[in-house]
């Protein structure tokens, strides 16, 4: 009986060691695509917001832009760290790195500004910059929400706790900022009449 118990104990211990040696992959390719995509997506938002001081943005737009830069930089750091920790490719935080991979033809990620829109925003100054910034950033944020919805629509995706929290935070933060920016844009339109 002792010998049998020792044998069972040895088998259980060796199974536990084998299981511990294999890291359970609790994420999907959709999770990786989402996290990697957010790096380029957020980099474009940071570039847009970074133009506020040099483009004559109003004080309220500058404050909004500072918040966007801080929040999205933090999320880029999270995304890069998560990808590294999971042995996945970490794309550069390049605002031009916004083409969806795996497509037969280049396609912008949801909400991303085209090169023409970026040039239009970069050329704008003062109240015109404010108006275009709000219009384009609302579009950009709506795209991030679409990316979250696409992730959550994939069976098995966002089961990893940090990814679920990240996607949820993106959804809540972007929705809140869209509401704020819509009010700001409406105020801007009223004041220019």
Show the residue positions of the predicted features.
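All-alpha RGS (Regulator of G-protein Signaling) helical domain and cognate RGS-like helical scaffolds
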Residues: 19-193
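Positively charged n-region of N-terminal signal peptides that target proteins for export
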Residues: 1-4
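Bacterial N-terminal signal peptides
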Residues: 6-15
């Amino acid at each position: 009986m002792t010998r049998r118990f020792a044998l069972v104990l040895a088998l259980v211990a060796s199974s536990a060691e084998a299981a511990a040696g294999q890291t359970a992959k609790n994420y999907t390719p959709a999770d990786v695509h989402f996290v990697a995509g957010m790096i380029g997506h957020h980099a474009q938002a940071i570039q847009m917001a970074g133009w506020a001081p040099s483009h004559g943005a109003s004080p309220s737009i500058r404050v909004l832009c500072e918040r966007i830069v801080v929040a999205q930089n933090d999320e880029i750091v999270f995304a890069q760290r998560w990808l590294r920790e999971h042995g996945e490719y970490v794309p550069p935080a390049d605002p031009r790195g916004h083409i969806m991979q795996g497509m037969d033809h280049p396609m912008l990620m949801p909400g991303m500004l085209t090169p023409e829109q970026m040039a239009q925003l970069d050329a704008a100054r003062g109240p015109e910059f404010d108006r275009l910034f709000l219009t384009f950033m609302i579009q950009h944020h709506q795209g991030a929400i679409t990316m979250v919805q696409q992730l959550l629509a994939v069976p098995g995706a966002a089961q990893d706790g940090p990814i679920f929290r990240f996607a949820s935070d993106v959804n809540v933060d972007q929705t809140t900022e869209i509401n704020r920016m819509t009010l700001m844009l409406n105020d801007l339109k009223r004041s220019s009449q």
